[in-house]
Amino acid sequence: MASITNLASSLSSLSFSSQVSQRPNTISFPRANSVFALPAKSARRASLSITATVSAPPEEEEIVELKKYVKSRLPGGFAAQKIIGTGRRKCAIARVVLQEGTGKVIINYRDAKEYLQGNPLWLQYVKVPLVTLGYENSYDIFVKAHGGGLSGQAQAITLGVARALLKVSADHRSPLKKEGLLTRDARVVERKKAGLKKARKAPQFSKR
């Protein structure tokens, strides 16, 4: 009996409330923001790159505006116009439309000076037929060109403008023909031959 009373007194002396905590044990993890957060400089760079990709470059905006301008000036597209001419040179082909205006030249929806890289000779090629007849400030030139290089395209535009001016008046034929602006330049690069380095260049001959 004494052992039972001793056991009961020892159990009553224990306080479970003091040993058991009110909150369960919790494991603290670091916040996701602190682990994956970018440095301030890299975050700024990322935001700048995102804004740069969203905003379109000014060149594309100019092309879009010129496209709208050309469509407003040429209802129905190039094929529906009356004063039109096609010119060719080497591998280049140019479709030219003339409209009464102030002398603007637009090639592939870009300003001629920008498209021809500011080359004065190529810019002169484009306006030679108009200058010959004194119309350099009387017509706007709209061009769709493809194939070849810029030099070939500029010379193809020359022929296209001259042919388009014939549709304005048949009296233009004589002065344009006198300047050789209605002649199609049929010269193209000569093909390479087998056994030669180029079209005609041969390897050095050795007799012995």
Curated annotation (Swiss-Prot):
GO terms for biological process: translation. GO terms for cellular component: chloroplast; chloroplast envelope; chloroplast stroma; mitochondrion; plastid small ribosomal subunit. Belongs to the universal ribosomal protein uS9 family. Gene3D superfamilies: 3.30.230.10. PROSITE patterns: RIBOSOMAL_S9 (PS00360). Binds directly to 16S ribosomal RNA. SUPFAM superfamilies: Ribosomal protein S5 domain 2-like. This is Small ribosomal subunit protein uS9c. Residues 1-52 form a transit peptide. Keywords: Chloroplast, Plastid, Ribonucleoprotein, Ribosomal protein, RNA-binding, rRNA-binding, Transit peptide. One of its GO terms (molecular function) is rRNA binding. It is found in: Plastid, Chloroplast. Coiled coil: none annotated. InterPro entries: Ribosomal_Su5_D2-typ_SF, Ribosomal_uS9, Ribosomal_uS9_bac/plastid, Ribosomal_uS9_CS, Ribsml_uS5_D2-typ_fold_subgr. The keyword RNA-binding applies. It holds the Pfam family Ribosomal_S9.
